[in-house]
């Protein structure tokens, strides 16, 4: 997926341009293919497992097609994906809208945060100084990645897109959710990759509506500093 993203962007650079550290600075790829790893892990699990997706849903969708029996082993999926209250195509969905449609239509409960809420989780000057002033190996690497991201996107301060989904695993009350059904558009050109949300109290999908942005940022900083 790293290489695929770069190849896609060479042809048509999207507004949400992905960037990453050089390949040599990233952890080595696991020898087992991601799809096989998912299937084996889920089939061998003694209890239900919670999945987290912060990129394209290609591997999850492929695993569901290859081994439908894993559905009963997934209790729910947390995802940074989509945009539910404004008509924007979000990067993780547009990388593979068909995969996203398969996952959202699978019957698995999904708790998703989209651009509607992640764009509110923005660092301020003090947060950035704190990050850049730290000297631990982890935070040095995060500083390097943050500078690369800001340079690529043109933003002065980083936005906690994917980290918000991770924080939600730790504290669900950080985001006000709305329950309903998500439909991923895979027809036509203009709407391809849009995530359409229909409110329904009985729905198995929950999407973020409001976020306690300051608490999210503080939690992220706290965890990174304590770990790093």
Residue ranges, per PLM feature:
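Short glycine/serine- and small hydrophobic-enriched flexible loop segments
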Residues: 1, 62-65, 168
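Single conserved hydrophobic/aromatic residue that forms the stacking wall/gate
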Residues: 1-10
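A short linear-motif detector with a strong N-terminal bias
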Residues: 2, 29-31, 56-59, 88-90, ...
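Short hydrophobic/aromatic-rich motifs at helix boundaries and adjacent loops
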Residues: 11, 31-32, 71-72, 135-140
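Flexible, glycine-rich active-site loops centered on histidine and acidic residues
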Residues: 15
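Active-site histidine-anchored catalytic micro-motif
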Residues: 18, 22-120, 125-126
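Conformational coupling and interaction surfaces
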Residues: 94-98, 104-106, 110-228
